[in-house]
A protein has these predicted regions:
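Short loop/turn positions at the edges of beta-strands in beta-sheet-rich folds
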Residues: 57, 69-70, 90, 102
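C-terminal subdomains that position terminal phosphate/3'-OH groups for nucleotidyl transfer/ligation
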Residues: 98, 111-112, 120-122
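Extended carbohydrate-recognition surfaces in non-catalytic/accessory domains of CAZymes
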Residues: 1-63, 88, 116-128, 132
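Aromatic-lined ligand-binding clefts that engage carbohydrates, nucleic acids, or primary amines
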Residues: 58-80, 109-111
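Cysteine-clustered segments with highest specificity for TGF-beta superfamily mature ligands
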Residues: 105-116
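Preference for bulky hydrophobic residues occupying beta-strand positions
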Residues: 49, 65-67, 96, 110, ...
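Short, surface-exposed tryptophan/glycine-enriched loops
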Residues: 92-107
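Short hydrophobic beta-strand segments in globular cytosolic domains
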Residues: 82-85
Length: 132
């Protein structure tokens, strides 16, 4: 099975979020790697990015979002639908199956909430993995 990766480089949009995970700040454009600033370690961050459906996929194609991060995100959504119910983890890579869940244009959302036991969220890189 052949694997192809499409890097989801910037720009990304970042929003600081409250305890309920809802945005409480204006949108700030950012690039990866993204680190939550020390001044906002008590809150969380919602990172969003749009991407187009890749060409040449069919019913046998497996699609995954892969995030390289210092910890597991609290939530991952594609087009508003949660996909983080069962992430596969290998080292610092978190893989989410999105087969059959994408449209012509898509919105990826990654939520990191603040924790008291860990350092701030760092999202190093992200990509769309195509297996088929």
């Amino acid at each position: 099975m052949k694997t192809h990766r499409i890097r989801l480089a910037g720009p990304w949009d970042s929003h600081l979020v409250g305890d309920d995970g809802q945005p409480v700040s204006e949108v700030i454009r950012c690039q990866l790697p993204f680190t939550l600033p020390e001044t906002h370690q008590e809150s969380g961050v919602l990172l969003t990015r749009g991407f187009h459906c890749p060409t040449g996929i069919d019913d046998s194609t497996i699609l995954r979002i892969v995030l390289q991060a210092n910890r597991s995100p609290n939530a991952v959504r594609v087009n508003g639908i949660a996909i983080s119910e069962c992430p596969q983890r290998l080292n610092a890579e978190f893989s989410f199956d999105i087969t059959g869940r994408i449209e012509a244009f898509n919105q990826l959302s990654v939520l990191f909430m603040a924790t008291t036991s860990e350092c701030g969220a760092v999202l190093n890189t992200a990509w769309l993995e195509i297996r088929g």
